Amino acid sequence: MSNIIVELKHVGKRYGDTQVLKDINIEIEQGKFYTLLGPSGSGKTTILRAIAGFLDVSEGEVLFDGKRINDVPANQRKVNTVFQDYALFPHLNVFDNVAFGLRLHRMSKQDIQTKVEDALKMVRLQGYADREISELSGGQQQRVAIARAIVLEPQVLLLDEPLSALDAKLRKDMQYELRELQERLGITFLFVTHDQEEALALSDEIFVMNDGEVQQSGTPVDIYDEPVNHFVADFIGESNIIQGHMIKDFLVEFNGKRFECADAGMRPNEPVEVVLRPEDLDITPANSGKVNVEVDTQLFRGDYYEIVGYDDLKNEWLIHSTNPAKDGETVGLTFDPEDIHVMRLNESEEDFDARLETYEGE
């Protein structure tokens, strides 16, 4: 039996001549934490609104529990939304904000009392029922918005950048709370953000969006370690992306040298892009590593130094090191074959997955 609760099949959305969603195909399973991740204008919030019923799609189908819901009004869908600005009613106290939807459903006073108390307990706001919204911190207001959304017991909770208005420390605290809440509730969360660190920390699965298309989907580890294209490699974390050629399976050439790698399934001498993450580079004395770079600048980031250098071919290198380097000095860089990730130019996610299965199965 399938546990897919939401599915988008060949979904497109146009505003006049502008195509904002292009052939979107995604499957969302019950009880998991999903994230739509991408820059502004990538289409992630449009997908959220299409699932919620706040807009009509131009092409394709939106399915809920296997049934087409394109024509089902928003108030009849088994989803609820937490908005970026929380959309709380300032003239109502905490209890009445959370109870608002229950009253629209004409529930009894006793049922409303019980459900509101349970929802506030779930978000750790016991004792706040009589507080005015203006008396609450940003984090507390966000919890009220979540309580109002979950009190109606939706099967899917949609969250549209709910942490964006919070300061850095509170955002991190709320990440833990959101993840814990999702696990306690056991319902599906679909979270929208442009913050890749948030997405990596929270998600069971991420859909990376750009220009109205899903560039890649997968677990945070898969997407970080195996980006399918230049956009994903550059957008998720920080990367050194260098032009090269795939000499043969498990051997790649860049910077005028050949290196063993863990990739295969490409044409001999095919042009490729090589990805090396800054944290995978170790600094050695000059001429004792695999690449020499001249240190240009460095910044202290608290638990590491962020060092920028340039090789003889003027490629920029970003290095994360626990030890500082001296501006202007030449150092060596070393890395393991498994640290090298080779990307074909313009390879689709489908072709990437097929190639990966072929050579990993050998």
Curated annotation (Swiss-Prot):
Membrane topology recorded in Swiss-Prot or TrEMBL: Peripheral membrane protein
Subcellular localization: Cell membrane
Binding site for ATP: G38, P39, S40, G41, S42, G43, K44, T45
Enzyme class, spelled out: translocase
The EC number(s) this enzyme carries: 7.6.2.11
Domain of life: Bacteria
Keywords assigned by UniProt, alphabetized: ATP-binding, Cell membrane, Membrane, Nucleotide-binding, Translocase, Transport
Cellular component, GO annotation: ATP-binding cassette (ABC) transporter complex
Entry keyword annotation includes Protein transport: no
Catalytic activity: ATP + H2O + polyamine-[polyamine-binding protein]Side 1 = ADP + phosphate + polyamineSide 2 + [polyamine-binding protein]Side 1
Pfam families (alphabetical): ABC_tran, TOBE_2
Matches recorded under InterPro entries: AAA+_ATPase, ABC_SmlMolc_Importer, ABC_transporter-like_ATP-bd, ABC_transporter-like_CS, Mo/tungstate-bd_C_term_dom, P-loop_NTPase, PotA_ATP-bd, Transp-assoc_OB_typ2
Single Gene Ontology MF annotation: ATP binding
Keyword Zinc: no
ABC transporter domain residues: 6-236
Family indicated by similarity: Belongs to the ABC transporter superfamily. Spermidine/putrescine importer (TC 3.A.1.11.1) family.
UniProt subunit comment: The complex is composed of two ATP-binding proteins (PotA), two transmembrane proteins (PotB and PotC) and a solute-binding protein (PotD).
Physiological role: Part of the ABC transporter complex PotABCD involved in spermidine/putrescine import. Responsible for energy coupling to the transport system.
Protein name (database record): Spermidine/putrescine import ATP-binding protein PotA
